[in-house]
Each structure stands twice: as C-alpha cells, then as structure tokens.
From Swiss-Prot:
GO terms for molecular function: ATP binding; DNA binding; zinc ion binding. Negatively regulates transcription of bacterial ribonucleotide reductase nrd genes and operons by binding to NrdR-boxes. One of its GO terms (biological process) is negative regulation of DNA-templated transcription. This is Transcriptional repressor NrdR. InterPro entries: ATP-cone_dom (IPR005144), NrdR-like_N (IPR055173), RNR_NrdR-like (IPR003796). The gene is nrdR. It comes from the Bacteria. Pfam families: ATP-cone, Zn_ribbon_NrdR. Keywords: ATP-binding, DNA-binding, Metal-binding, Nucleotide-binding, Repressor, Transcription, Transcription regulation, Zinc, Zinc-finger. It comes from Chlamydia felis (strain Fe/C-56) (Chlamydophila felis).
Length: 152
C-alpha cells in the first residue's frame, strides 16, 4: 500500500479496530515520509466461480443476478428493495457453502425458492427463462406446482 498523498510505500498502522457495520477492519495509518494520516478499511473478498451451462467458469456477478430478478419482477409488486434483498439472500447462501464453485443450476434454484415466496408471476417468468421449457407440458408442471390449491 502507498500513501495517497505522496505515494510513498512505507506506512505505520496507528490504530486498528473492528468495524462490524461494514464487516471490515478499520485501520488508521500514517505515512513515514510526509506524516499524513488516513483511514483504510480491510474486507474479506470471497470470490465464487460460476460453472456455466457450456462448461466455462466465470466470476459470480451480483449485477447479473439483480438484472435477472428485475426482468422477472417487472410490473409485479416486487420493488427494488425486495430485488436487492433476494439477491443478497441468494449471495449469502452461496457464500455459506463450502464449495466456491457453484453451478448456474444452484443459483437458479435458490432464486426460484425466494421468488416463489415473494411473487408467483415473477416466479413463473423466471422459471420460463431459467428452465428453458421444451413444451407446454413442462410449463404446466411449474404452474401447477406454483398453485397447489388448484385442481389438477
């Protein structure tokens, strides 16, 4: 790390504290060259590798998850706060797993679990894209499972 004021590479840590609200460590540093003080926050970066359907791996991107949720929940009662809450819950569950390699199937199933609780229309829209139905029968299975009180 370098001093943001003079770009000198030698720094001294003056104080170090937990910052639980940011899930980080807050450090007060002083440059040994210019004497300026500044604060840094250190956080753990856990990267997830997503196994795509075609066999490629790519880094997990929460923005892609949010875009998919936005598309599924457009014109429903799900607002942006709930979209972000669902994305956060999905990401937390994925980070809680021991394996840092996850499949798109795992992500899709988690999203469907949360959407089913939140809004049935968003759930069905997401299922249509995620599951790539081959015929109407597959769609009907999802519709019937989504509405257990309907007669089959």
């Amino acid at each position: 790390m370098q001093c943001p004021f003079c770009n000198h590479g030698e720094l001294k840590v003056i104080d170090s504290r937990n910052a639980p609200e940011a899930n980080a460590i807050k450090r007060r540093r002083e440059c040994l060259n210019c004497g300026q003080r500044f604060t840094t926050f250190e956080t753990v970066e856990l990267t997830l590798q997503v196994l795509k359907r075609d066999g490629r791996y790519e880094n997990f991107q929460e923005s892609k998850l949010i875009n998919g949720l936005n598309a599924a929940s457009s014109h429903t009662r799900i607002g942006q706060d709930q979209v972000h809450a669902i994305a956060s819950n999905v990401k937390s569950e994925l980070l809680g797993k021991q394996n840092r390699e996850i499949s798109t199937k795992e992500i899709g199933e988690l999203v469907m679990k949360y959407l089913k609780k939140a809004d049935m229309i968003a759930y069905i829209r997401f299922a249509c894209v995620y599951r790539r139905f081959k015929d109407v029968g597959e769609l009907m299975e999802v519709l019937l499972s989504a509405t257990p009180d309907m007669e089959k």
